[in-house]
């Protein structure tokens, strides 16, 4: 599972010119599910996202989470995060999870964010052609990849989230 997490002043997503999701100060997340991803990965990713301390405290240090600042989130599905470009110039998406299963993990991730204290979690429309607008704050952009966490010997239930 891959997630590109961006600290934003605000973000919105539109389909056919109509805004379908938006957030104020907080995080905008691009979410991609891969073939080997599990519900446990979605839960861990949500826990890590909610606890990620990338907002500045009174001393200017990145020491606060989106929960700490009562921030909002916009989560957008993006299967192209799972692209493989090792061979040739055209990306292969065979590593992306099939849409029905990926949508379930996407929705689970959003629900787990709420369970982890995020009060406002809005989304795009899964599988739609979307136009995304945002003001990236910093910029601060973090990449999460649960496959790398697994390969480094970290198990989902033992990764630190503090």
Can you describe what each PLM-predicted range is?
Residues 7, 33, 77-78, 134-136, ...:
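Flexible glycine-/small-residue-rich
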Residues 45, 76, 140:
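Residue-level signal for inorganic ion chemistry
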Residues 19-70, 80-95, 99-111, 115-116, ...:
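Compact, glycine-rich, soluble single-domain proteins
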Residues 93-156, 162:
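Positively charged, low-complexity, intrinsically disordered RNA-binding extensions
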Residues 63-80, 126-137:
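A short beta-strand-loop-alpha-helix capping motif that often carries His-Thr
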């Amino acid at each position: 599972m891959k997630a590109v997490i961006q600290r934003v002043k605000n973000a919105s997503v539109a389909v056919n010119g109509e805004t379908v999701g938006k957030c104020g100060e907080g995080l905008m997340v691009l979410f991609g599910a891969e073939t080997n991803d599990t519900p446990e990965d979605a839960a861990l990713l949500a826990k890590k996202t909610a606890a990620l301390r990338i907002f500045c405290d009174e001393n200017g240090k990145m020491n606060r989470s989106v929960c700490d600042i009562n921030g909002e989130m916009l989560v957008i599905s993006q299967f192209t995060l799972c692209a493989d470009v090792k061979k040739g110039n055209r990306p292969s998406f065979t590593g992306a999870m099939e849409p029905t299963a990926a949508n379930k993990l996407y929705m689970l991730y959003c629900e787990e964010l709420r369970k982890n204290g995020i009060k406002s979690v809005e989304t795009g429309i899964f599988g739609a052609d979307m136009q995304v607008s945002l003001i990236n704050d910093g910029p601060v952009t973090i990449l999460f990849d649960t496959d790398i966490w697994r390969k480094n010997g970290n198990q989902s239930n033992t990764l630190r989230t503090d």
